[in-house]
Amino acid sequence: MVSALTRQTGQLLSQKALTQWLWRGRAVKLADGTGVSMPDTAENQAAYPQPSSQAAGVGFPLARLVMVSCLATGAALDMAIGPHQGKGSGELGLVRGLLKGFNPGDVMLADALYGNTSWSPI
């Protein structure tokens, strides 16, 4: 419910953005990711295993977060969370699931990772 409310509120705020905050009439959406550690519980270890470089029982579970926000309003539009390692767990893998929130003509502003020529969002 909180996720749905966040997306809906972000979308409503984004639609009310002042035109001077648009780039050539286009909405600009920011995308970025980060990693976070979390408490060492059995549930967290199962969903977000600690890196294999850490000894068992010594490290913490790690998750990767990716968020899309509106440049004009600062509103959070959507986010994804996944394990820190494994197939499809990188920022690019997670952001693919967020592309449904982009409209034709929107501009994605992101760091150099997203400029990787082997990544095609469409």
Language model feature labels by segment:
Residues M1-I122:
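Conserved, well-structured functional cores that handle cations and Mg-NTP chemistry
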